[in-house]
Amino acid sequence: MISSITRLLSLVLAAGLSTSALAVEGDWGQVAQALGKSGSEMPGGVYRIGLPRTDLKVVLDGVEVKPALALGSWLAFRSEGDQALVMGDLVLTADEVSPVMQKLAEEGIEITALHNHLLRTAPATFYMHVRGFGGPAKLAAALHDALVLSKTPLTASSGAAPSQIELDTALIDRTLGAKGRVNGGVY
């Protein structure tokens, strides 16, 4: 149990905080092929695949929620010798949760949390945190088999969202004391 927690914490730190040199040991091409979508190599030997739910039109209190704001599924792999650790966060609709969860359990992928970030959305969206350890391509294939039970797009995105948005970004920057950036129509 402590070994699993240590591995999980090291992946979280590597994915979010590490600035060490790139040290990819895995064959991420096999992961991309098995999953059906490629990702990018991150610092700390992490291979991350973004899976934004661009197929969903989610509305919260009359406001459309953009995928870049709160609908971004992702998976991150890190080599552990000839094995890999994977963790991620899958954005799912209510009707997708049960079949995806069942398939992941059958394939030996752990569900570490199921919750929602946004109340009152239509459709309702849920966030399933996952974790697995094993052969990288086998993990990716298991995740693919679960994701195809949802409508999560597994192809490249259709292009970048406009870089201009209708916000006073200078005021936001001054107020926060930091410069932001536009990403997928979100600042």
Describe the predicted segments one by one.
Residues 94-112, 122-162:
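Hydrophobic, ordered structural segments
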Residues 21-25:
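Boundary at the C-terminal end of the N-terminal hydrophobic targeting segment
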Residues 8-20:
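Bacterial N-terminal signal peptides
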Residues 1-6:
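N-terminal secretory signal peptides that target proteins for export/translocation
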Residues 93, 161-187:
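Surface-exposed interaction/gating patches
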Residues 57-76:
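Intrinsic, low-complexity N-terminal interaction/targeting segments
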Residues 79-87:
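Acidic/histidine-rich, surface-exposed loop or edge segments in extracytoplasmic proteins
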